[in-house]
């Protein structure tokens, strides 16, 4: 049997993540890249290949707002951990207050699903945030915990140890008072999800077991290679 490493235990993994400043270091590193971004598109598309508990993407969005204060921002955040999503949601209230035209999508879909324009296996749902202040949005977002527990259940393969979602969900969150401005960017089905992104975040605090090239291709296939960090 292969020797276990710290990330095979969620408790050990969380202990490592929460006792280091690695995520903050990554977020500030990303700030340096934002300054070099130039885009003429009407919306800025971001893919976070694994949001975790949201420290990196939340901090990154605050920095992105500094450079693109008036441009709509569209984020696809991929995550299968119920615990991580609940923490992520607690961070996003202030981001929606800071950047009014933010569209934040949370999904448990695979990368293959996101790149398949004809898939009918993904359920699309929307949440319109009502309010003006960060605390208004935070209350709504944190009330989603039962919804997340219900829709982010996993199935386990006893033969190979793999896990996958029991159902595939794509949840789109935006401010209701910005719906008119954002209506052309709110996805209704898989074909309306961006296939190219202006910025990809693919950050893990450990060495993946999967082959590096295979993993990079999964992350970068929907985006220009020179934006991969």
Regions found by a protein language model. Give the residues of each.
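Conserved class I S-adenosyl-L-methionine
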Residues: 42-52
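Class I S-adenosyl-L-methionine-dependent methyltransferase module
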Residues: 59-194
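A short, conserved alpha-helix within the catalytic core of class I
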Residues: 208-218
